[in-house]
Amino acid sequence: MMSSSKETAKSLIQTKSRSSIRNMFDEVAPTYDFLNHLLSLGIDNYWRVVAAKKARKQLEGEREPKILDVATGTGDLAASMAKIPGAKVTGYDLSPEMLAIARKKYPNIEFLEGFAEKMPFDDRSFHVVSAGFGVRNFEDLAQGMKEFHRVLKPGGCAYIIEPMIPRNAVMKKLYLIYFKNVLPKIAGMFSKSTFAYDYLPNSVEQFPQAEAFTKILKNAGFKKAEYFPMTFETSILYVAMK
């Protein structure tokens, strides 16, 4: 069973097909919030707050800022962004099961279903685009970032949170032991979709980090892109300005 799970995860890493990613998140939706908070020891909420605080500072003076949260999942980052005064937030995700939970949790936020690489929004529609722990799952990362850029207003910013593999050798070793050996076993106790938690560490390892990802953002058209490691470099916030 474990071998099959790991093989499924490796296959998903290689293809990143939209339908497979959607099916995976549909499967994990019932336990997603519980496991996210458990496996991150609750620190994931802090990371969202950091992103929302930076967005709030950017939006000072905007009376009705429009915010798009892509790969919104069950809506937690969208909800953090919705605390910004006057904000109108739209959550957007490919998984109908995740969105069903988001709508129950946050009935005052609009949630729409679709793919990030081709979004149904007009050019220059949003002051902020955010994404928490989702862009590494895009089938076409470069195209997804071009869409982020397209729908942002001039001067608008993208705020993207992703897991990070620590650069410190000791922290990196401990992190990978936890991610690859401990995390999947804990997840397997609560979730039927064990391959999703074999997929997670592999997807983080495959994702371009720090300078490599800011280069992708600049290639997508952003005039400025920077990053902020958080919590001993276990997570990272990217901020890109159009």
Curated annotation (Swiss-Prot):
SUPFAM superfamilies: S-adenosyl-L-methionine-dependent methyltransferases. It is an enzyme of class 2 (transferase). InterPro entries: SAM-dependent_MTases_sf (IPR029063), UbiE/COQ5_MeTrFase (IPR004033), UbiE/COQ5_MeTrFase_CS (IPR023576). It catalyses: a 2-demethylmenaquinol + S-adenosyl-L-methionine = a menaquinol + S-adenosyl-L-homocysteine + H(+). GO terms for molecular function: demethylmenaquinone methyltransferase activity. It holds the Pfam family Ubie_methyltran. Its EC number is 2.1.1.163. GO terms for biological process: menaquinone biosynthetic process; methylation. Keywords: Menaquinone biosynthesis, Methyltransferase, S-adenosyl-L-methionine, Transferase. The keyword S-adenosyl-L-methionine applies. CDD domains: AdoMet_MTases. S-adenosyl-L-methionine binds at T74, D93. Pathway: Quinol/quinone metabolism; menaquinone biosynthesis; menaquinol from 1,4-dihydroxy-2-naphthoate: step 2/2. HAMAP family: MenG_UbiE_methyltr (MF_01813). Methyltransferase required for the conversion of demethylmenaquinol (DMKH2) to menaquinol (MKH2). Belongs to the class I-like SAM-binding methyltransferase superfamily. MenG/UbiE family. This is Demethylmenaquinone methyltransferase. The gene is menG.
